[in-house]
């Protein structure tokens, strides 16, 4: 079912009542007013009035004067307030994973697909600590080196959790974990034909990035440097060119080591940053998660504000007139 809500098209699995829709959107029905196809829906009727395919809805609330300056970003028709995406691996335990994700403010978390431990099926799983009802799970193909393995993995992920929004990564070798672009292109084509919405890990090559966008990928995720290296963004110029070349969201994926790396990615104009090791392997992962949250926000504000032009000469801050 397709709905247009506040001017944006959104997809839902089935028809539902206004009350159920607000619940799925995480909106408190007591604090909003709803208009459906230009007709106001009385609050007393939220549980009875159905929304159907093609309906147009406006959901409004009171604000404290002026416009809402929330700086969200949208991928595959879904809107998120946090531009920080985090991985769930490499932590000492699931409890630390959950605490770090909470501190980061992230709404999207990547999850790898692995076989169930049949020798101990009662062993705790990630979903026991990090709920897919609270966060958007982004299944990925970490550890896959061929297009066929990647496609197979994501089909299993969709069967397990019903997720169509996925992160594709096809690795070239175990030493660099650099993206294998021919296999990535092959896998992306197959997944898109199969109805997946593909966010794709790729090289920092603007030509390849444009090819992936033209195929139908919903987000381009060039590496800043090698996965887990912490080397930061080695080629900021190519990242900027990719951002200028494609229209879909661009998120730096891999290589971030500290908060300044995350801020730089955002200052380049990127729509977001995905990281895992930088938080999980910090001496204090919870504190680093908070640092990354603030770095993303600071870098984004800096980009929106616009930096001063660089000069090759001095320009005094104080006025020169009236000197004694």
Curated annotation (Swiss-Prot):
It is an enzyme of class 2 (transferase). Pathway: Cofactor biosynthesis; thiamine diphosphate biosynthesis. Coiled coil: none annotated. Its EC number is 2.8.1.10. It is found in: Cytoplasm. It catalyses: [ThiS sulfur-carrier protein]-C-terminal-Gly-aminoethanethioate + 2-iminoacetate + 1-deoxy-D-xylulose 5-phosphate = [ThiS sulfur-carrier protein]-C-terminal Gly-Gly + 2-[(2R,5Z)-2-carboxy-4-methylthiazol-5(2H)-ylidene]ethyl phosphate + 2 H2O + H(+). One of its GO terms (biological process) is thiamine diphosphate biosynthetic process. Its main location: cytoplasm. GO terms for cellular component: cytoplasm. InterPro entries: Aldolase_TIM, Beta-grasp_dom_sf, Mopterin_synth/thiamin_S_b, Thi_S, Thiazole_synthase_ThiG, ThiG, ThiS/MoaD-like. 1-deoxy-D-xylulose 5-phosphate binds at residues 228, 254-255, 276-277. The keyword Disulfide bond does not apply. Gene3D superfamilies: 3.10.20.30, Aldolase class I (3.20.20.70). It comes from the Bacteria. Keywords: Cytoplasm, Schiff base, Thiamine biosynthesis, Transferase. The active site is at 167 (schiff-base intermediate with dxp). Homotetramer. Forms heterodimers with either ThiH or ThiS. Catalyzes the rearrangement of 1-deoxy-D-xylulose 5-phosphate (DXP) to produce the thiazole phosphate moiety of thiamine. Sulfur is provided by the thiocarboxylate moiety of the carrier protein ThiS. In vitro, sulfur can be provided by H(2)S. PANTHER family: THIAZOLE SYNTHASE. This is Thiazole synthase.
